[in-house]
């Protein structure tokens, strides 16, 4: 009886832990009521944070990443964290859902993405080339046009941009009812100004697309996390949170564009702020 009781307690504890880290993919998991209203009205809500805040650009003291079964990880170990909340008006049916799915896996469609350059004070080219690959090679593969939605698919793509050079990402796309979760994990170390700042799998970008029929579209929450293992690089101000916040905003605006929505006037996430070097 005693052994049975202990076993029962352990099972209950395990269940409680699992429930805690596996929050539902609901709008309220990622958005407060005020945030929901703001994004439906057209706002895009960014946050950015970097350890030591050497350039005094952190917009918040910390960023709490909502935890789900798709991102059960301790994000406090990351030295750079940025996130963004936005809303995509979208009429959902079987055909449009598949279209959205294929847009998310259109790696070649990322070529030409622009970001707001503080140095230039205007939009500049971010992604010079992007395409699907099979491995860590330059062998270009065509995008796959899916004719049905799978619970999970995985691909790899190469991305060359004018800030971080050539990167390789593992892309995972999950389908959960009418919702999607996309995870891009950089599978090579990142170099910044000749310094290798982290190891492989230490730069990640998550995107959650939660459909709300009443609102008529997707509530979207994206975040990126980056390890920077050299304190000297962080303390020197070489790593700016705006650099990564602007990258995240670039991907948001480009996704809108791929869906036929012009948000180019939202390319600068920090209008009137952080414009000086």
Label each PLM-derived region with a short phrase:
Residues 131-180:
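Long, positively charged binding patches that form subdomain-scale interaction surfaces
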Residues 163, 168-207:
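Hydrophobic-ligand binding "helix-grip"
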Residues 4-15:
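Sec-dependent N-terminal signal peptides
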């Amino acid at each position: 009886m005693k052994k049975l009781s202990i076993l029962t307690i352990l099972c209950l504890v395990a269940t409680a832990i699992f429930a805690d880290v596996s929050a539902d993919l609901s709008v309220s998991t990622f958005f407060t009521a005020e945030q929901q209203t703001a994004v439906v009205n057209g706002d895009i809500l960014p946050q950015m944070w970097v350890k030591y805040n050497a350039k005094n650009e952190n917009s918040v003291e910390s960023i709490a990443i909502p935890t789900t079964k798709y991102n059960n990880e301790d994000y406090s170990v990351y030295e750079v964290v940025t996130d963004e909340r936005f809303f995509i008006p979208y009429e959902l049916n079987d055909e449009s859902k598949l279209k959205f799915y294929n847009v998310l896996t259109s790696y070649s469609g990322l070529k030409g993405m622009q970001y707001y350059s503080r140095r230039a004070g205007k939009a500049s080219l971010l992604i010079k080339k992007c395409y699907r690959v099979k491995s860590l090679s330059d062998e270009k593969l065509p995008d796959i046009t899916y004719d049905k939605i799978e619970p999970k698919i995985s691909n790899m793509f190469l991305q060359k941009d004018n800030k971080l050079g050539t990167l390789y990402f593992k892309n995972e796309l999950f389908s959960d009812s009418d919702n999607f979760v996309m995870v891009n994990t950089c599978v090579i170390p990142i170099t910044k100004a000749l310094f290798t700042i982290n190891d492989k799998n230490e730069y990640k970008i998550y995107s959650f697309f939660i459909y709300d029929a009443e609102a008529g579209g997707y509530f979207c929450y994206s975040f990126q996390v980056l390890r920077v293992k050299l304190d000297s690089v962080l303390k020197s101000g070489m790593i700016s949170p705006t650099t990564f916040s602007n990258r995240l905003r670039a991907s948001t605006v480009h996704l809108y564009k791929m869906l036929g929505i012009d948000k180019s006037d939202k390319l600068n996430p920090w209008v009137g702020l952080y414009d000086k070097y």
